[in-house]
């Protein structure tokens, strides 16, 4: 049971790491969220993004 708990915690930590690195800020300057849609589509395959602190964030 102790080994199962350790494996479960390791799996959760790895999953969080993978999910947070998958999407995020990309190196594209912007002034409006609509400028990020095409850039995010090219990088992540999804057109979901917004302009945050003059930099595109993709979801």
From Swiss-Prot:
Which keywords annotate this record? Calcium-activated potassium channel impairing toxin, Disulfide bond, Ion channel impairing toxin, Neurotoxin, Potassium channel impairing toxin, Secreted, Signal, Toxin, Voltage-gated sodium channel impairing toxin
Molecular function as annotated in GO: ion channel inhibitor activity; potassium channel regulator activity; sodium channel regulator activity; toxin activity
The species this protein was found in: Olivierus martensii
Annotated S-S bridges: 30-51, 36-56, 40-58
Task: Report the protein's function.
Answer: Alpha-KTx 16.2: inhibits large conductance calcium-activated potassium channels (KCa1.1/Slo-beta4 KCNMA1/KCNMB4). It appears to block channel activity by a simple bimolecular inhibition process. Shows a fast association rate and a slow dissociation rate of binding on rat brain synaptosome. Significantly inhibits voltage-dependent sodium current and voltage-dependent delayed rectifier potassium currents.
Q: In which tissues is it expressed?
A: Expressed by the venom gland.
Q: Which domain of life is it from?
A: Eukaryota
Residues the record annotates as the site (Aromatic residue of the functional dyad) are 59
Q: Which InterPro entries match?
A: Scorpion_toxin-like_sf, Scorpion_toxinS_K_inh
Q: Output a single Gene Ontology CC term carried by this record.
A: extracellular region
Q: Let me see what the UniProt entry remarks about domains.
A: Has the structural arrangement of an alpha-helix connected to a beta-sheet by disulfide bonds (CSalpha/beta).
- Protein known as: Potassium channel toxin alpha-KTx 16.2
Q: Which residues form the signal peptide?
A: 1-22
Places the protein is found: Secreted
